[in-house]
Amino acid sequence: MQYVFTALGLLSRLSLFVVVTPILAGWFFVWMVIATAFAWFAWLIVIIILSDVPMGEALWHWFVFWPMTITGWIIGASDWSNRTGIKLWGRKPGDSHGSARFATRKERAAFEGSDGLLIGRDLDTGKLLRYDGPAHLLTLAPTRAGKGVGTVIPNLLLAERSVLVIDPKGENAKIAGEARKRFGAVHILDPFGVTGMPASAYNPLGRLDAESPDLGEDAASLAEALVMDPPGQVSEAHWNEEAKALLAGLIMFAVAHEDADRKTLATVREYLTLPPEKFRTLLELMQDSIAAGGLIARAANRFLGKSDREAASVMSSAQRHTHFLDSPRIVAATARSDFQFSALRHELTSIFLVLPPNRLDAYSRWLRLLVAQALQDIARDAEASQTGAARLKQPALFLLDEFAALGRLEAVERAMGLMAGYGLQLWPILQDMSQLKDLYGARANTFVANAGVLQTFGVNDFETAKWLSQMIGRETTGYQTESHKPGDAPSTSYNVTARDLMTPDEIMQIDPSVQLLRVQGKPVIIARKLRYFADREFDGLYPPPDAKLAKPSSER
């Protein structure tokens, strides 16, 4: 019996199709005739009013006739479509459920200027896309996705501005070091001789002034960079804070009372590894010091006021965070200063911080120190009203590759929120959004909110893809449904709904040569990634692949 009802249903729908289709077609024809008649009537009135020549004999009559006739057809067809629900042509769904969309060709053309940082290449025209705004930038891309060849090196080769770049493998210095010399001075800080190129050094204590009222703040900033607070380890917070206080006091003492050649972090490490009785003597000397407005004496009193057990834990924490200073390579790299970070604002200067990936965990505090020092120096220089030196037109660029290796650094977080107007642009580069959230928690949004450009490619984890999908937004899309009831004409309806402009799985399936760019205040851009070794704009700016570089010395 079920098959009988199925057959009858099919026969009914077929009969309705055969009967209803001519009716709908006739309805459409009648509607078109009526609309055309109204158009002709309007045309006739125009001819009668404006012309004394018989209808159709003047050429301009026809220039009036056809537009009116076509307009009548369009009106009639549209009305018929609305009444029947049958879609005749592309119908715009509106934006009631979302207005997200991709950037148009005209909107992308705004980024094809000759100035600014390179962010990609237009898919249609092949022209370079640049960002010339003052805001910071942020890149999310997994390892081996092309961050170096597509983001870091292209900008190092062409950006005529001061640059500080974290260079984990030394490849950026090898490839772009010579090219940067045409802009200005180049300093490569390479404690482990990865690049085989002449290495510079920087002493974080070198610019501290014992007579400055800012000595306490400067020492605290260095201590903050030395002590890494692992995310989620609340139990370590007290010991780390006390270790910072002790380190700040020891740094101030070294600056105020040591000879010039001993005003280094190596001396601070030497203090921390003294035998207990000698360290006690050092603390007593600090108590007698009147330098730094009494801050040195206060630091000693604070430590001596602790119980033996608490003091031992604080001492252990301070020693742990300065263990990297036992390396002769790091000692040599921090023994003198070949430049000042404030020069980044006044002279075209390039600084490469080279640390091999296999040493990032052990020596990341060295990177933290230098980045924190650079940010503080630039901020101080910008605030110094007495300086007469002219500032460079373009802001200094901080390309912070392997950003997560720095750990949570308050100086960077403050810079993302406050220092865009100080002649500084930060460009943190991370593997995924999880890295940023692990380090900064809810305050990770500070980085996203202050990024004028968000660049993403090669996304292969669902959480980052989901976050991107939500951030890109939703579009309003339309769809048509048909329903059939026995004995009734088919019913067609047009509906609208919301859809992610790009779903997480679509983001994860993007071609490896393509990237997403979200520029502040603009629709999302789909662009091609750059490849310095294959793109003609970079020809002749870097050494050929077979160029022989000096091998790093085992003694450096």
Spans of features found by a protein language model:
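Basic- and hydrophobic-enriched, low-structure N-terminal and domain-boundary segments
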Residues: Q2-A145, V149-V152, T195, P204-L205, ...
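P-loop NTPase motor domains
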Residues: V4-A7, L11-I23, W27-T36, D124, ...
